[in-house]
């Protein structure tokens, strides 16, 4: 009888923990927080952070053209090195 009760407790504990993990994942998804191991969500959050960083920076046309020319020069330099 004690063995059956112990097995039942272990089984119920497994179900409760599994449901709690699923609820936490749903909560994170609803809030837009990338969960552990969700590389797709993490990549999307990284891209959003980069976009926000760019939007908050000085994005005047003169500064953008300077930044683009620096990027082009760096790309040319790296391509010529390889």
Curated annotation (Swiss-Prot):
> Quick one: where is this thing mainly located?
secreted
- Tell me which tissues or organs this protein is expressed in: Expressed by the venom gland.
A Gene Ontology molecular function term for this protein is: toxin activity
Q: GO terms for CC?
A: extracellular region
Q: Which UniProt keywords apply?
A: Secreted, Signal, Toxin
Q: Which residues form the signal peptide?
A: 1-21
Q: Name its cellular compartments.
A: Secreted
Q: Which family does it belong to?
A: Belongs to the scoloptoxin-21 family.
Report the protein name in the record.
U-scoloptoxin(21)-Sm3a
